[in-house]
């Protein structure tokens, strides 16, 4: 098993001032452990109208700085916030890149992430026929820029609609995405 440690933006109400210090301590204690593989999942989530963008940005930058300092890749949650995430990554220039979890952006955003050393995580959402823009974007990208992920038990693929998602579905997801 491998571990990544981070403070997710969907739980902003639960994060406290001391959490960044605690995260820094956790990472420092595990830096020599090869099972500590990344900082994450963290990022920006602008989906809700009540999203505190300033607080999220501060938490995002603090964790990105930890990733840079620890020389660890980042697992990033990005929802309706690609422009801000890309701009921030350009300022910090993390040497290890990482993965954009559940990528849903444009071809231009995909290219920017690639330049910054990030791969794009794809899973069940990309198998849905109504995900037209995402499917068109995937078709334009080189396979080595993509990473399969399940986000189990959530984000089930179209062929397994309204059921619990599972890593066992990855071969079929890969087949469907390869056909694009």
Write out the residue ranges for each language-model feature.
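Structural detector of well-ordered beta-strand residues that form the stable sheet scaffold
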Residues: 2-4, 75, 99, 121, ...
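Short, acidic/turn-prone active-site loops that include or flank metal/cofactor-
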Residues: 7-9, 104, 124-128, 152-153
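His/Asp/Glu-enriched, well-ordered alpha-helical/loop segment
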Residues: 143-150, 156-180
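His/Asp/Glu-enriched short active-site or ligand-binding loop at hydrolase and phosphoryl-transfer sites
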Residues: 117-131
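Divalent metal-binding pocket/active-site signature
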Residues: 9-116, 136, 141, 155-168
């Amino acid at each position: 098993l491998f571990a990544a440690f981070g403070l997710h933006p969907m739980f902003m109400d639960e994060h406290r001032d001391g959490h960044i210090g605690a995260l820094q301590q956790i990472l420092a204690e595990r830096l020599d452990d090869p099972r500590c593989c990344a900082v994450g999942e963290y990022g920006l989530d602008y989906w809700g109208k009540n999203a505190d963008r300033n607080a999220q940005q501060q938490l995002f930058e603090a964790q990105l700085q930890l990733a840079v300092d620890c020389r660890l890749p980042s697992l990033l949650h990005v929802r309706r916030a690609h422009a801000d995430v890309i701009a921030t990554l350009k300022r910090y220039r993390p040497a290890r890149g990482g993965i954009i979890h559940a990528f849903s952006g444009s071809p231009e955003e995909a290219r920017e992430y690639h330049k910054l050393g990030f791969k794009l995580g794809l899973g069940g959402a990309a198998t849905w026929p109504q995900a037209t823009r995402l499917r068109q974007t995937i078709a334009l990208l080189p396979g080595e820029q993509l990473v399969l992920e399940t986000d189990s038990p959530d984000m089930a693929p179209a062929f397994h609609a309204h059921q619990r998602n599972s890593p066992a579905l990855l071969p079929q997801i890969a087949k469907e995405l390869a056909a694009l």
